[in-house]
Design a protein with these regions (language model features):
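Gly/Gly-Pro-rich "capping" loops immediately C-terminal to redox-active cysteine motifs
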Residues: 36, 52-80, 102
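The canonical Cys-X-X-Cys-His
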Residues: 35-49, 96, 111-115
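Extracytoplasmic/secreted proteins, especially bacterial periplasmic and envelope-associated proteins
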Residues: 30, 34, 38, 78, ...
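Bacterial N-terminal signal peptides
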Residues: 5-15
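Electrostatic cytochrome c docking/interface patches
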Residues: 16-38, 54
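Inter-heme linker and motif-flanking segments adjacent to c-type heme-binding CXXCH motifs
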Residues: 52, 117-121
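Axial heme c-ligation environment in periplasmic c-type cytochrome domains
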Residues: 59-64, 85-118
Length: 121
């Protein structure tokens, strides 16, 4: 039983995001400079100007976009879906609205490019 526990813990440790070696999908056609004002207008009210999720009026608290152990392992396609279709589309909070009707495909890619420029910790 002890060996099984050790093996299971080892498997969890090796497959955790901090140790994953997979390449994470990144878009190459987003423009962070164009995404900055879009982020400020549509995202910062909840996620904060610095991406740290400063809107403490929400429960659960808004996702911190600058946590290195989180954001570095999130594919751009996932972020695209969350922004375009809302949190519910990926099993997350319904408080995250769908911006696909407001933002173009390029706008969303630009916002993602801007998010990728935020300092992580």
């Amino acid at each position: 039983m002890r060996l099984l526990t050790i093996l299971m813990l080892g498997a969890i440790w090796l497959t955790s995001p901090a140790f994953a070696q997979e390449d994470v999908e990144r878009f190459t056609d987003g423009n962070a400079a164009n995404g900055a004002p879009l982020y400020k207008r549509y995202c910062s009210g909840c996620h904060g100007a610095d991406g740290r999720g400063g809107a403490h009026t929400f429960m659960p608290h808004i996702q911190n976009l600058t946590r290195k152990d989180y954001i570095e392992f999130i594919p751009d396609g996932f972020l695209y879906t969350v922004i375009a279709e809302g949190g519910v589309a990926v099993g997350k909070s319904g408080y995250m609205p769908a911006w696909g009707g407001t933002l173009s495909e390029q706008d969303i890619k630009d916002v993602i490019a801007f998010i990728r420029t935020l300092p992580t910790y």
